[in-house]
């Protein structure tokens, strides 16, 4: 089986070649994620909400540990989104405990998991309920000219970056996509819910990235065209662009963006030449598109351009770049870094030069 690389799974950069190279995730603390949840919690109800810090632990395993410690079935443990294993992350979980007192969750805690806050609420935590994620990234072993880095960072702060799904979505070497294609060709859906979700997501994400890669290559990823479906940064609804909509000032302000397809049942509702492009993409991957539709996936949209909120940076040491920013839920910090630096595996940098 051939291994799929970054260009196979994502596409070209929008802002030119990387300014240099660095290491990300030399230790878990180098990649910190804080979930941003805009839900006022009532303090009472049959759902126990937990603000959890985890280190080197994926979300699904954390949920299993919390469920076992609470003595509840896994279906009664909820979380808003999946967070990286190789990171220090803080996110919410909820446990459905009707008529039960708060359980002792000490068995779930350890060096890799701490419960920082507990409160009650009347409803469970829904998937995708978080508004955003805040990131603090520490890039070490930096080899780059600082003036070039600063200019690139200013540019992406002003213009955003292509909103690719990151490599994490596709598994090691693109294995999740390989498995998705295999399922599609056999017209099968995995019985295991987590595997099914993982493979369907990989298939949809790949099709979206293919479309976005085409628009990055031609320079139209950040411009609206007649027939595009436009969406605001934090909205799942969209509307068709005509001539007037293409001149909307909110496009230049990075509040409104063209979108691409998250494939599902039926043809995309885009118009004019945009629809032709999206149907041509479907025609190049017919088995995958049929499989996604048959699985009952609804046709959705995702913004092509990723605005970066509150981007700040500094150099705590000559060979270290620290970044802080906020991204909408479902977007990948690694695609931001990709527009700045090449990432090299831990231990493969030479002694860095300080510029």
UniProtKB/Swiss-Prot annotation:
Tree of life domain: Bacteria
Top EC class for this record: isomerase
Chain segments annotated as coiled-coil in the UniProt record: none
GO cellular component: cytosol
Alphabetical list of InterPro entries matching this protein: PsdUridine_synth_cat_dom_sf, PsdUridine_synth_TruD, PsdUridine_synth_TruD_CS, PsdUridine_synth_TruD_insert, TruD_catalytic, TruD_insert_sf, TruD_pseudoU_synthase
Keyword set, alphabetical order: Isomerase, tRNA processing
Catalytic activity from the UniProt record: uridine(13) in tRNA = pseudouridine(13) in tRNA
Residue ranges occupied by any TRUD domain in the UniProt entry: 160-306
Gene Ontology terms: biological process: tRNA pseudouridine synthesis
GO molecular function, one term: RNA binding
Matches recorded under PROSITE patterns: TRUD, UPF0024
Keyword check for Isomerase: yes
Catalytic residues (UniProt): 84
Pfam families in the cross-refs: TruD
EC number, as in UniProt: 5.4.99.27
Classification via HAMAP family: TruD
Family indicated by similarity: Belongs to the pseudouridine synthase TruD family.
Task of the protein: Responsible for synthesis of pseudouridine from uracil-13 in transfer RNAs.
Protein name: tRNA pseudouridine synthase D
Organism name: Pseudomonas aeruginosa (strain UCBPP-PA14)
């Amino acid at each position: 089986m051939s291994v799929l690389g970054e260009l196979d799974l994502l596409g070209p950069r929008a802002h030119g070649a990387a300014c240099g190279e660095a290491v990300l995730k030399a230790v878990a603390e180098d990649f910190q994620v804080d979930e941003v949840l805009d839900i006022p919690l009532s303090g009472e109800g049959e759902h126990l909400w937990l603000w959890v810090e985890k280190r080197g632990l994926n979300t699904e395993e954390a949920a299993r540990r919390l469920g076992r410690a609470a003595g509840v079935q896994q279906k009664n443990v909820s979380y808003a989104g999946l967070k990286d294993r190789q990171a220090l992350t803080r996110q919410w979980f909820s446990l459905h405990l009707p008529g039960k007192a708060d359980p002792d969750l000490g068995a779930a805690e350890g060096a890799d998991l701490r419960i920082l806050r507990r409160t009650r609420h009347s409803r469970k935590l829904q998937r995708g309920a978080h508004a955003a994620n805040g990131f603090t990234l520490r890039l070490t072993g930096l080899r780059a000219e600082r003036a070039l880095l600063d200019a690139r960072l200013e540019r992406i702060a002003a213009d955003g970056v292509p909103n690719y799904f990151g490599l994490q979505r596709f598994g090691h070497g693109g294995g999740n996509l390989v498995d998705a294609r295999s399922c599609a060709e056999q017209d099968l859906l995995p019985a295991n819910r987590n595997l099914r979700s993982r493979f369907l997501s990989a298939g949809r994400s790949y099709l979206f990235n293919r479309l976005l890669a085409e628009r990055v290559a031609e320079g139209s990823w950040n411009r609206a065209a007649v027939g595009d479906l436009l969406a605001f940064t934090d909205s799942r609804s969209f509307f068709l662009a005509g001539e007037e909509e293409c001149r909307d000032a909110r496009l230049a302000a990075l509040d409104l963006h063209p979108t691409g397809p998250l494939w599902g049942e039926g043809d995309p509702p885009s118009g004019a030449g945009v629809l032709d492009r999206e149907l041509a993409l479907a025609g190049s991957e017919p088995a995958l598109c049929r499989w996604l539709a048959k699985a009952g996936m609804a046709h959705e949209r995702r913004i092509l351009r990723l605005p970066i909120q509150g981007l700040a940076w500094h150099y705590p040491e000559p060979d270290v770049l620290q970044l802080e920013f906020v991204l909408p839920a479902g977007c990948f910090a690694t695609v931001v870094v990709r527009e700045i630096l090449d990432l090299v595996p831990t231990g493969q940098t030479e002694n860095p030069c300080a510029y």
